[in-house]
């Protein structure tokens, strides 16, 4: 493996350690949590729409999400390994036969709908995601409990030191 691919793989592993993205493909309805900076304030904004394409590979991998906002089509291209993408949630699995769904740009109304995939693979992916999300919630809850216990112990030690000095 050449040096550039090796460095890209290391960076991808570093980013993947911080957050995990679910397996999704074109046709899936996604909710992307994006960090937006306005002036000196930073907030997280949700962008929900249909994934119409995935392109690139390695650190340059992107996915395009399309939604209809106030009757106007809006598309955003998100880099998979961008630090601005906080989380991606699969709302529903779509059943499509194409890798690029650019034809949806010309469609309106019912013809732009994508039927839901209820096959075995979709069920397996949904179950795996639910399990991973439950584990993540349990891990976060355990971190909160550990932090609360550490804070309580620190507070008790400070009170004991204060009582000893009196």
Curated annotation (Swiss-Prot):
Which family does the UniProt entry place this protein in?
Belongs to the bacterial ribosomal protein bL19 family.
Which Pfam families does the UniProt record give? Answer: Ribosomal_L19
**Organism listed in the record:** Chelativorans sp. (strain BNC1)
InterPro entries reported for this sequence: Ribosomal_bL19, Ribosomal_bL19_CS, Ribosomal_bL19_sf, Translation_prot_SH3-like_sf
Q: Which residues form a coiled coil?
A: none
Q: Which UniProt keywords apply?
A: Ribonucleoprotein, Ribosomal protein
What role is this protein assigned? This protein is located at the 30S-50S ribosomal subunit interface and may play a role in the structure and function of the aminoacyl-tRNA binding site.
Q: Which GO terms describe its biological process?
A: translation
Q: Name one GO molecular function term.
A: structural constituent of ribosome
The GO cellular component terms are: cytosolic large ribosomal subunit
What is the recorded name of this protein?
Answer: Large ribosomal subunit protein bL19
């Amino acid at each position: 493996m050449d040096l550039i691919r090796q460095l890209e793989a290391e960076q991808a592993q570093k980013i993947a350690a911080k957050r995990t993205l679910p397996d999704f493909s074109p046709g899936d309805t996604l909710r992307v949590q994006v960090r937006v900076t306005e002036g000196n304030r930073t907030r997280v904004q949700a962008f929900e729409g249909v994934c119409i394409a995935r392109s690139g590979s390695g650190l340059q991998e992107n996915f395009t999400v399309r939604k209809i906002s106030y009757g106007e089509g809006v598309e955003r291209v998100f880099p998979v390994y961008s630090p601005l993408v906080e989380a991606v949630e699969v709302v529903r699995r779509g059943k499509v036969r194409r890798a690029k769904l650019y034809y949806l740009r010309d469609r309106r109304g019912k013809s732009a709908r994508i039927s839901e995939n209820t096959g075995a693979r979709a069920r397996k992916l949904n179950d795996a995601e639910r399990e991973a999300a439950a584990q993540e919630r349990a891990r976060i809850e355990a971190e909160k409990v550990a932090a609360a216990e550490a804070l309580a112990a620190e507070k008790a030690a400070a009170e004991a030191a204060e009582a000893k000095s009196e």
